[in-house]
A protein has these predicted regions:
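Active-site "gating" loop of Rossmann-like NAD(P)-dependent oxidoreductase/epimerase domains
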Residues: 44-48, 52-55, 85-104, 135
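Mid/C-terminal beta-alpha module of Rossmann-like enzyme folds, strongest
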Residues: 158-204
Length: 212
């Protein structure tokens, strides 16, 4: 949300300390704030943390999302939910929005759980995407993991276009298919390494490209 604020000063980032979505009181706080649209990017995203403390992940990623959905339903607000490409199975790649989902890990299962409540909001959009910090944080990167992931400064403007539109439903957001090694090498010097099993989470981006 901070990156989105850099692009549009009318957007107001909300801190976890003041707006803890796992606490139902967040509904009353949002009622007082009265936003035009809710952009939900908050989540427990570290898969290791999710595995170690699944209850916390459930409280934030699933129950917290349900709280935001409840607010948006009760007050007729637009809800923009940042989901993950990992809800797809990662087998053949080029996943489109109507493909069956089979989350890759527990983190992705919690994000799919969040999607379920978001779908009940009449004016909702679910953005399936993947992005990283402006600099790749590791010295090695997988050359057999294919993705449409890009850096947050690339993806954030794409998300903002959706926020300002009247698009609803599910939409994939990313850039051209590449390996994680190729992605990392755009901005860093890294060495290639391999997953035990090759995976392909690349996204079919036709819907986004047709709309924007």
């Amino acid at each position: 949300s901070i990156h989105l604020q850099y692009l549009d000063s009318s957007l107001v980032p909300l801190s976890k300390e003041d707006y803890d979505i796992s606490d139902k009181s967040v509904i009353d706080k949002l009622t007082d704030l009265n936003p035009d649209v809710v952009i939900h990017a908050g989540a427990v995203t570290d898969s290791n943390v999710v595995n170690r403390n699944p209850i916390s992940a459930i409280q934030t990623n699933i129950i917290g999302t349900a709280h935001l959905a409840q607010y948006c339903i009760e007050h007729n607000k637009r809800l923009v939910y940042i989901s993950t490409d990992y809800v797809y199975d990662g087998v053949e790649g080029n996943h489109n929005e109507t493909d069956p989902v089979l989350p890759y890990n527990n983190y992705a299962w919690t994000k799919l759980g969040g999607e379920c409540s978001v779908r009940l909001v009449s004016n909702h959009v679910i953005i399936r995407t993947s992005f990283g910090n402006p600099k790749f944080p590791y010295d090695v990167a997988f050359d057999n993991l294919v993705t449409s992931k890009d850096y947050v400064d690339v993806i954030a403007p794409m998300i903002l276009k959706i926020v300002k539109s009247d698009v609803t439903g599910i939409i994939n957001v990313g850039t051209q298919s590449k390996t994680i090694f190729e992605y990392a090498s755009q901005r860093n010097t890294v060495l290639p390494t391999k997953l035990p099993t090759p995976m392909n989470f690349s996204l079919n981006l036709n819907r986004y490209e047709q709309l924007f």
